[in-house]
A protein has these predicted regions:
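Transmembrane beta-barrel domains of Gram-negative outer membranes and organellar outer membranes
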Residues: 45-314
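Cleavable N-terminal export/targeting peptides
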Residues: 1-73, 314
């Protein structure tokens, strides 16, 4: 999902009547276009290379006569786990976020890559610990004056203790601590503070639907004395539907409330995701559009998302 689950505070304003595109933006667009073209060429030259999970002859052959049904069942379960942020599934989402319209003149741009490994650890027959890390790599320009910054931003680490089985009514939940680590390589990309607080997620999955909420709150407790304190709430309600061909349609918000500045940042995300196999590797590709319903004074107007998630089922 996402991760994806993390939020960022921006400043506001946002007109894009006269957008100015940097070489980085052009290169990013060209890279994406080349990647899509390369995958298309590969798919045409080898139809078995890039395919929906339902068309996995190697899996079917290994299971005998009923292999096709077995492969479909495994694919369906994998698609279901993909929509669960605390599933017992090792995954590595790489989320590319592009935002436009920020900064004092409304011509700011930010490109953020969130590397978000998810690792479940079995504690006992009844309990699992799920670690979710968000490591952001950022390039931005014209957001703080006319300058640009690039490098690592602050890392968020969430630990969810979750029952191994859903409740009798089908609800899945997890709770634990969340930590803010001051890993930013530029003062303008991070808070300069250590932070911690509670985090929790609750969700239900039935008949192809997944719906629920992820939330956390972080207070700073140490760090650079000259920097503002961190006191922020993150809320992510989500709703998704997965088809029989393992295409998922998702709508969510990744809302942050800054209690220091009394300001909401509310991006609405609309995303589509397809689960496929690249060679023998299960991979999910996601495209999304983001509209900022509420934002600080110099925040972005809108954004796009392209994500690739590598899956490592047991």
């Amino acid at each position: 999902m996402a991760a994806a689950f993390g939020g960022a505070g921006y400043s506001r304003r946002g007109r894009i009547e006269n957008p100015r595109y940097s070489r980085l933006e052009v290169c990013a667009a060209m890279t994406l276009a080349c990647a899509l073209a390369a995958s298309t060429v590969q798919a045409q030259s080898d139809p078995g290379y890039y395919r929906p999970l339902t068309l996995a002859p190697a899996d079917a052959a290994s299971s005998g006569g009923g292999g096709g049904d077995d492969a479909k069942a495994k694919a369906a379960e994998l698609a279901k786990q993909l929509q669960n942020p605390i599933a017992s599934l090792v995954s590595v989402p790489i989320q590319n976020n592009f935002d436009w319209g920020a900064g004092p003149d409304g011509d700011g741009f930010q490109y953020k890559v969130n590397v978000q490994p998810v690792i479940p650890i079995t504690l006992s027959e009844d309990w699992t610990l799920i670690t979710r890390t968000i490591l952001p790599i950022v390039y931005q320009q014209n957001i703080v004056g006319t300058s640009s910054q690039s490098g690592l931003a602050d890392t968020t680490e969430s630990l969810f203790f979750s029952p191994s089985k859903p409740t009798k009514s089908g609800w899945v939940w997890g709770a634990g601590p969340v930590f803010l680590l001051p890993t930013a390589t530029d003062d303008l990309l991070g808070a300069g503070k250590w932070g911690a607080g509670p985090t929790a997620v609750v969700l239900k999955q039935e008949k192809g639907w997944t719906y629920g909420m992820l939330a956390n709150h972080i207070w700073s407790f140490a760090g650079e004395s000259g920097r503002s304190e961190v006191n922020s709430t993150f809320l992510q309600p989500f709703l998704s539907y997965t088809t029989k061909t393992f295409t998922s349609f998702t709508v969510n918000t990744e809302s942050t409330y800054d209690w220091q500045g009394h300001q909401w940042t509310v991006p609405l995300n609309f995303m589509v995701q397809q689960l496929v196999k690249v060679g023998k590797q299960p991979v999910a590709f996601q495209l999304g559009y983001r509209y900022y319903a509420e934002r600080p004074a110099d925040g972005p107007d809108w954004g796009l998302r392209f994500a690739v998630t590598l899956l490592f089922p047991k």
